[in-house]
Amino acid sequence: MAVPKKRTSASKTRMRRSHHALAKVNVITDAKTGEYRLSHHVCMTHGTYNGRKVITDNVNTNDNNNNS
C-alpha cells in the first residue's frame, strides 16, 4: 500500500483545500415583480428576459380530450 513518508502539514492541507470553497450565487431582484432570480436568466413568472417576452404561454386551443 502507498503510505506517505512525511506527515502533511496543516498549511499544505489547507492550501490543497483552498479550491473546495463554494461559489456565491449571483441573485438579483426582478425589476417588474420584485422576486429573486438568477442574473442573466429568464424570469420564469413572466417569461421575460431583458425586457422582451421570450417564453410564450402554451394555451391548448383544442378542446379534444381524446375521450372516445
From Swiss-Prot:
Is Transferase given among the entry's keywords? Answer: no
**Where in this chain does the entry annotate a coiled-coil region?**
none
A GO term for molecular function: structural constituent of ribosome
* Annotated keywords: Ribonucleoprotein, Ribosomal protein
Q: Name one GO cellular component term.
A: large ribosomal subunit
- Cystine connections: none
Report the record's Gene Ontology biological process terms. translation
Matching entries from InterPro entries are given as: Ribosomal_bL32, Ribosomal_bL32_bact, Ribosomal_zn-bd
Q: Which family does it belong to?
A: Belongs to the bacterial ribosomal protein bL32 family.
Q: Which HAMAP family match?
A: Ribosomal_bL32
**What name is this protein filed under?**
Large ribosomal subunit protein bL32
What are the top taxonomic ranks of the organism? Bacteria, Pseudomonadati, Pseudomonadota, Alphaproteobacteria, Rickettsiales
Q: Which gene encodes it?
A: rpmF
